[in-house]
Amino acid sequence: QGGGVSILPNPDNYGNIGFFMAGRSMRQIGYANDLISKLMEFEIKDWEFKNAKEIILDQLESIEEDDISSQLFVHDALINKTQKWTTKENIEATKKITYEDVQRIYQEFTNSIFLDIYAYGNYDPSEVVNFAKSARNIIGDTSQKIHWRDIPDFSVKTGTARMKKVSISKDGVGLLDNYVYPVKSEEISIQLNLINRLMRPTFFNELRTLQEVGYIASSFDSETNEYPTLSMLIVSDNTNLKDLKEKVMGFIYSFVVAFDQLPDSTVENTKKALLDEMNKIPENLGIEASQYFADWGEGNYSFDTKQKAKEYLENTTKQDLTNLINDFFIQGNYMNTTV
């Protein structure tokens, strides 16, 4: 940071490690070359290995002390296969790792580096090309000839459910209830985002403020392994899990009925607010660059996801949302995952 550049580890969602550099463009390539050189010359010391192992174990063993909502997301990642191993499995594996194991893995890693560079800013294209060549020379040959992405073996089966009940040391109960659409679709994801913006204030007011079901009551849209997903989160110290699930289901069906009476103008105003967010001029180059990170990580080198999202949103009508809500919750065209 002293040179005007922040360097941060930046792992992606597919099992790859990267480094994110933000700051003065003219200094970044020099720092990147130095970083790569140090990575390739890195010597793992036994005492550093022992300290790192202890820190990792402390972090893993403290997960059970996290708040209920945090632990819900840990277990949610397991049933949705975005996380491969349980905390217990990670702890057991970490305990077994030896100094020799880490040295071997380091050698395997450095011999299989696939280099992928995303540069956004005041760069001459030839400068980036020359950096790629110099970085490849520093790293040397690689056994990895394509960009590796770890894609979970996950499919959505309509009408099915995955449920996991976990006992923890914290007082109270929590529920994370996900409704996963069976088709990968950017358009559906955008429509779910719009539906959630219309639903979330009512969900909070009804379950948190009026019924006082829980001290946390929120809904959000996301993607589960690229499948559009609508989720409800409740944490309570005065309600049991069965009642929480019933409250969520009751709210959903009341929302479906109420949505028909929602004025078209409310949908259009919400659309406009979301479009205004998308069209907002980024505050700085870092924010501007970050909007394309997901495309880069997924190998979409057209970098057009944001533009497509705006087009989908502009073309969405209230009837489209009504059709999706009915398909989701009346026809039951979803898979339910619950922790």
Predicted regions and their residues:
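M16 family metallopeptidases and their MPP-like homologs
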Residues: 1-41, 50-96, 112-121, 172-193, ...
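C-terminal, active-site-flanking charged/polar segments
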Residues: 137-140, 199-203, 249-254
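A short, acidic, amphipathic alpha-helical segment used as a generic capping/interface helix at domain edges
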Residues: 101-104, 316-329
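His/Glu-based metal-binding/catalytic segments typifying zinc-dependent metallopeptidases
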Residues: 141-202
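Glycine-centered hinge/linker elements that transmit conformational signals in sensory
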Residues: 131-145
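Non-catalytic, conformational "gating/processing" segments within enzyme and secreted inhibitor domains
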Residues: 77, 99-135
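Glycine-rich, charged/polar anion/phosphate-binding loops
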Residues: 101-103, 158-164, 215-221, 322
